[in-house]
Amino acid sequence: MTTLTETTHPGGFLVWEAFRDYTRETVTIAAGTLEPGTVLGKTTASGKYAAHNPAATDGTETAVAVLWGKADASAGDVAAVALIRGPAIVNRHDLVFTGTLSEPEIAAAHAALVAVGILVR
């Protein structure tokens, strides 16, 4: 019998949002193949989004958004929808971080999301 594995769903991390036309926007993803719920940072120089990286110094070290659906930017920039502001509440267990983050780094990312109105519960 084949074993099926359910992957993340677009918007599956979202618990509540006030106004979807206000909280979500189409953004440009600069690099990587990212899953729904990936925490994003914004590159200061280009204004493009990429996976949050606390070790970076290009702007992506600060968590500012959450990717709505899968985005494959492995061959170049792609447009994708992201939750970029609140009021909204997301499930912390459904957020995706790239790399291996420490608990303090995850807590800092959660706090940065709260700063833009995205509550992490």
Residue ranges of predicted features:
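Surface-exposed, low-hydrophobicity beta-strand/loop segments enriched in small/polar/acidic residues
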Residues: M1-R121
